[in-house]
Structure formats: structure tokens, C-alpha cells
Amino acid sequence: MPHFMLLLHSDPSGLQQLSPEEMQKALEKFMAWRNKPITRDGHRLTDDPGRVMRSQAGQIRTTDGPYSETKEILGGYYTIEAASYDDAVRLAQDHPTLEYGGTIEVRQVWGT
């Protein structure tokens, strides 16, 4: 069965505004989703903007972030099994990232 990456984009300050009780409830939702049978792998990423590496004129350049003008960052990922893109999108519709204002990019893993 094909594998798909769910790339989770969100504004990290959104979850930080939750009360401790709301944060616990959110964490439980994320963990429940991670434990679904379709999920093969998944992790949260740190809130820092990371680094972007580019080759320019034969030299490797490293910059902070991917985009300094946006608040949304790549905050995590999941690898899931699904029959098709449509199936992967349907399965991702109840992911808590969407509930908390984030977006999900769905991409098929090459060779699966």
C-alpha cells in the first residue's frame, strides 16, 4: 500500500496560548492520532525555524528559517498508509493540527 507524508505546518504560538488543561487535551488528541493503525511514523519538530541550505555559485550557504516573513513553521510529520491521495486526504481530515489552526501538506512517498 502507498505511503504518504503528512507535513504539519502551524504557528507555534497558537498552542502556547492554551491553558495547561487545554494543552493536555491537545496532547492527548495528537497522541491518539499517532497511535492509529494507519500511522507508520511521526514526530513533532522543535519550534525553532531550523536552517535552510542552498548551493549558490558552487558554495553552500546556510540561512535561518525557511521563511522569515511567515509565522507558520513545519512543526511535525507523519507517515501513513493509504490507498490513494484521496484516501490520504480523507484520513488526515480529523488530524488535530487542523483543529488548532494549522495546515497539512500531503505528499506521496516515492516508490511506495
Language model: regions and residue ranges:
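Conserved, structured core segments of small domains
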Residues: M1-T112
